[in-house]
């Protein structure tokens, strides 16, 4: 999850098209399956996940921090994921701090299978043991708001770069790609 969060941060704040292609190609090269496929699906917004509504996240956060502080922070920052990731209290339980975040595939599987109530509890536990960047990525994933400045065409270009395949070959099979945990389980 940490590597994926860093990739999202890089993609979000890198204006250069070529630098984004290199960042994605490096991620794909250094990430095992099925996580690289899930990352591709998440970046291109082709994943279907159970989402938390912004009001649910707002309520969840206000149960952890002063509601007025949250409202003022959100008003100032303007982005809910960024506000929550910055304002979420650092957990004082050292056991939670050392708790491992799930791999991207594990996170996606949980997001696809958990009920709305179980999802809220799960997200709370994740946010408690995550860094600021990881919290931001988790919130973007659970709200379905993963817009990081990457089009499907740019993702295809990075795949061509990573795989040393021609872009037209990638485009020919693109419509056949399936980003579900079922597909990962079959391999």
Map each language-model feature to its residues:
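A short, hydrophobic C-terminal helix/tail in secreted or cell-surface proteins
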Residues: 182-187
